[in-house]
A protein has these predicted regions:
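Positively charged n-region of N-terminal signal peptides that target proteins for export
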Residues: 1-5
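Start-of-domain marker
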Residues: 20-84
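Domain-level marker for long, solvent-exposed, non-transmembrane regions
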Residues: 6, 20, 46-51, 141, ...
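C-terminal motif of bacterial Sec signal peptides marking the signal peptidase cleavage site
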Residues: 15-18
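Mature, soluble, non-transmembrane domains
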Residues: 77-219
Length: 219
């Protein structure tokens, strides 16, 4: 019997079998420190989710209680807080609208990658999966995607694959300095050129039709 809780990228996705949006935001200061915010929003499907939470299991997955969900979020918060260079960790579990949020500050971007690594190890995920998603050096911010998401996707059951068909993602990166250039041409910058945004479809990302990778050079 399968049981899924808060994992690095998709929280309760297979349990809720619902439309969702992932929002990733990084605020980078010139000194390399910054703030990270990650949201998974199921609010469009809250009626369906309320019904699912009354069940014991769905598609082989055990349905956790609301107290169990909160407990797992607390574990994630404690794990991140114990990571060197990470501070002010806050998780918010909105079980009315089903919006799950984690906020934290980092001294340098590598601290954030370390927190992802600790989270991966705590879930006993494939040790070969890279968690080095971000780098920042010499006025260059790089978002990479090294996880073989297509391969992982193909291993899923058909019913699990379906949840990604309408899923969306948004990435927002903000800086003290203005943006000189960026590699992902689907991105758009703010009028001040101190922020850049990328919207897309998760299934298109899985199939390779869209990319989340971006190399952003600052002035």
């Amino acid at each position: 019997m399968k049981k899924v809780y808060f994992i690095p990228l998709l929280c309760f996705v297979f349990l809720f079998q619902s439309c969702f949006e992932v929002i990733e935001e990084v605020q980078m200061k010139d000194d390399g420190s910054g703030h990270f915010n990650f949201v998974i929003n199921f609010s469009q499907s809250k009626t369906k989710i309320n019904s699912i939470l009354k069940m014991q299991k769905i598609n082989g997955y055990t349905i956790p209680s609301k107290d169990e969900i909160k407990k797992e979020a607390s574990k994630i918060e404690a794990l991140a807080q114990s990571t060197s260079g990470i501070s002010n960790v806050k998780t918010n579990i909105d079980l009315t609208n089903y919006i799950f949020t984690i906020d934290l500050d980092f001294q340098k971007i590598s601290n954030l990658n370390t927190a992802f690594l600790k989270l991966k190890n705590s879930r006993k995920l494939d040790p070969s999966l890279s968690t080095d998603y971000f780098t920042f050096a010499d006025k260059k911010f790089i978002r990479t995607q090294k996880i073989p998401i297509k391969t992982l996707y193909e291993k899923l059951e058909k019913s699990d694959k379906e949840v990604f068909q309408t899923a969306k993602y948004t990435s927002v990166y903000k800086f003290d300095s203005t943006i000189k250039s960026f590699s992902n041409k689907n991105s758009t910058t703010s009028k001040s050129r101190k922020a850049i945004k990328l919207n897309g479809s998760i299934i298109s990302l899985i199939n390779g039709n869209e990319k989340i990778e971006n190399t952003i050079t600052l002035n």
